[in-house]
């Protein structure tokens, strides 16, 4: 069972030389891989970027999907998604699952070499009926006219979702779960067929499999981030970082005005 460790806290920034573990969320790893300057400002200096827009409707859909799966979990049977897609698995039961799903508790692994606690909140887990291995499952909701194209799961922006699954897989493998190489994205899409609102939205869905890479890259990245956070030099801006480009133009404008 999960026991809260009082030595762990969601620190605002990393303090070099401290013996207190630093909790690093899955999103911070992703931030580091996207833009090292933004990651340094965030994790080392405590200067956060703008908060993402709150996707309240998406959160509600996630909640309802979890309820559906929890009903099936209690009965030890498939959901309609697993049944209709011929996936031989059922929602996985574990005493810590509710904790692993909760954002500010989450699934955590203390990487002793770096003294970093890596944390991530999973949406769901399925157990393969044959191998008994565990599938990582993530819920996604959207509205797109190109849902068929999305199902190919090869757009460049989706790399973040793929990394997300692999980070969860790494954490849970360290918590002694036998992880299946195939993870699933349960995507729901608001349909184009609906012509009027009538206080509801109609959705179609797709269950998209993703064959994960060897997720041991996560540990290499954690060690890299640890060394990165120990330095005192702010990295150069990343060319394709929208926030860095905005800040560059902003300061150029201020200089001209002054």
Explain the meaning of each model-derived region:
Residues 1-133:
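Metal-dependent nuclease catalytic cores that hydrolyze phosphodiester bonds in DNA/RNA
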Residues 54-55, 147-159, 204-211:
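Short histidine-centered catalytic/ligand-binding loop motif
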Residues 15-18, 23-24, 171-258:
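Metal-dependent nuclease catalytic regions and adjoining charged, substrate-binding loops involved
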Residues 46, 140-145, 190-192:
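Short connector loops/turns at beta-strand edges and beta->alpha or beta->beta junctions
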Residues 161-173:
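An active-site-proximal "capping" alpha-helix that borders the catalytic cofactor pocket
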């Amino acid at each position: 069972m999960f026991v809260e460790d009082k030595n762990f806290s969601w620190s605002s920034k990393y303090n070099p030389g401290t013996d207190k573990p630093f909790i690093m969320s899955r999103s911070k790893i992703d931030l580091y891989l996207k833009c090292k300057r933004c990651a340094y400002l965030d994790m080392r200096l405590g200067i956060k970027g703008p908060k993402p827009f709150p996707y309240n409707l998406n959160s509600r859909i996630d909640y309802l999907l979890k309820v559906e799966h929890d009903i099936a979990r209690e009965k030890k049977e498939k959901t309609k998604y697993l049944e209709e897609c011929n996936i031989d698995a059922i929602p996985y039961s574990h005493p810590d699952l509710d904790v692993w799903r909760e954002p500010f508790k989450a699934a955590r692994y203390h990487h002793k070499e770096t003294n970093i606690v890596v944390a991530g909140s999973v949406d769901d887990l399925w157990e393969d009926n044959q191998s008994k291995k565990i599938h990582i499952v993530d819920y996604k909701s959207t509205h797109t006219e190109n849902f068929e194209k999305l199902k190919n799961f090869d757009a460049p922006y989706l790399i973040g979702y793929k990394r997300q699954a692999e980070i969860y897989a790494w954490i849970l493998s360290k918590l002694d779960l036998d992880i299946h190489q195939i993870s699933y994205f349960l995507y729901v899409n608001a349909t184009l067929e609906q012509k009027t609102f009538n206080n509801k939205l109609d959705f179609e869905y797709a269950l998209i499999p993703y064959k994960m890479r060897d997720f041991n890259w996560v540990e290499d990245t954690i060690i890299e981030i640890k060394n990165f956070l120990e330095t005192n030099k702010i990295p150069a801006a990343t060319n394709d970082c929208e926030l860095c480009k905005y800040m560059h133009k902003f300061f150029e404008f201020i200089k001209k005005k002054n």
